[in-house]
Amino acid sequence: MHDIKSIRDNPQAFDAAFTRRGLAPIADSLIKLDETRRIAIIASEQAQARRNAASKEIGEAKKAKDNARAEALMAEVTELKTTMPALDEAVKAADAALKKALSEIPNLPLAEVPQGADEHGNVVRSHFGAPRSYAFTPKPHYELGEALGQMDFEAAAKMSGARFVVLKKGLARLERAIGQFFLDVHTGEHGYTEVNPPLLVKDDAMFGTAQLPKFSNDQFRVDTEEIQIKSAYEEFEKAKNAILNYVEEAGIKSAREEKLEVLGFAYEPNPDRRWLIPTAEVSLTNLVRESILDEKELPMRLTALTPCFRAEAGAAGRDTRGMIRQHQFTKVELVSITTPEQSKDEHERMLACAEEVLRRLGLHYRVMTLCTGDMGFASQKTYDIEVWMPGQGEGGAYREISSCSVCGDFQARRMDARSRGPDGKPRFVHTLNGSGTAVGRALIAVIENYQQEDGSIAVPDALLPYMGGLKVIANS
């Protein structure tokens, strides 16, 4: 969320940064919404002040035995009592309109972020290692896994539908080993505190990290009541004329008013609604919501290994085979809470932590600095780590395995997460998040990079302590 005061103070600078994302200038419209809100607040405050003054004057008029004035003042107070609720509602409506507008626009890119329209504008920052050489044509992970009898997409589809997988035997253990290895390095060597967070969160938590309201269609929602409301609204649309006629005939209220009420009810935020987390970033970052931290405690570094759930609404037709794009996957998340002065250095540190676990697995990768047109909604700057997968496409391909982003105070404002420095004044913290890394994609990378000509998978040295003596995953 952006600070409307900063936008009002320097709209040109805001629009200059905002339009770098390929979006139209928006500062003027935001300022107009803010002006409407401020006018509504002034009108409400003036009415309240006049009511207080008139109430005091009534006593003075009665004391002076000026009954005519007292009665006139009482009539004025009565009228103010009647009009003030509408003024208060106007304030709420104007405030909600501004908040909605601010909540739906992305963060501003830092000045050093490269300009670009999409992924083609991303810039290679560095490489590690080189692609492995094979005396045979490398196969994709799903062919290897199915041939081993340890990766079952058909069974998963029967119980859950498309974009799910059942892992068995050595591959199931290998995935568990990868996640455990990542956690051990991040907690034992990189200074992160392990957290076991909830997988179900409320609207406010998803709003805080900016998954809501803009990306609701990409999430899995768990709310029977909401589903019933949506279904009822769809039925309402199908039989709209009959229902509106019934409402008018029943005399409940005008058809137009009733329709608006139904629309509002169907989409009103529900405090009882829950969402499956798309990433542990949501749970970890929200640990500091509505709090004031001592800056001596910062940076705060948190990590979690959790299942993640994504609807992949915009991924139709992409990566339909294999484990690359699943509705459910496992990921180790890294989150840092810092001061504004620390956040840039912390971003570099987080990237190094994510790189380290891939280096120890002996995986070739490259680091990309994302351009303005490819960054996430809440990000000021993002590094992507793309690991080499020799079984992808024709001759192999780089695939994203980690994104490390600095968000500035964008999420902190949505969560009201602040810190108190030496001067004692609260200020918004900065938040960072990154994958450390995606366990499912790391599994794919290990399978494809460590495949052998007979279809077996050699276990990387770093994972041997977690595999119970299993050095090669073969068809048993």
UniProtKB/Swiss-Prot annotation:
It catalyses: tRNA(Ser) + L-serine + ATP = L-seryl-tRNA(Ser) + AMP + diphosphate + H(+); tRNA(Sec) + L-serine + ATP = L-seryl-tRNA(Sec) + AMP + diphosphate + H(+). The keyword Phosphoprotein does not apply. Pfam families: Seryl_tRNA_N, tRNA-synt_2b. Keywords: Aminoacyl-tRNA synthetase, ATP-binding, Cytoplasm, Ligase, Nucleotide-binding, Protein biosynthesis. Disulfide bonds: none annotated. Belongs to the class-II aminoacyl-tRNA synthetase family. Type-1 seryl-tRNA synthetase subfamily. Homodimer. The tRNA molecule binds across the dimer. This is Serine--tRNA ligase.
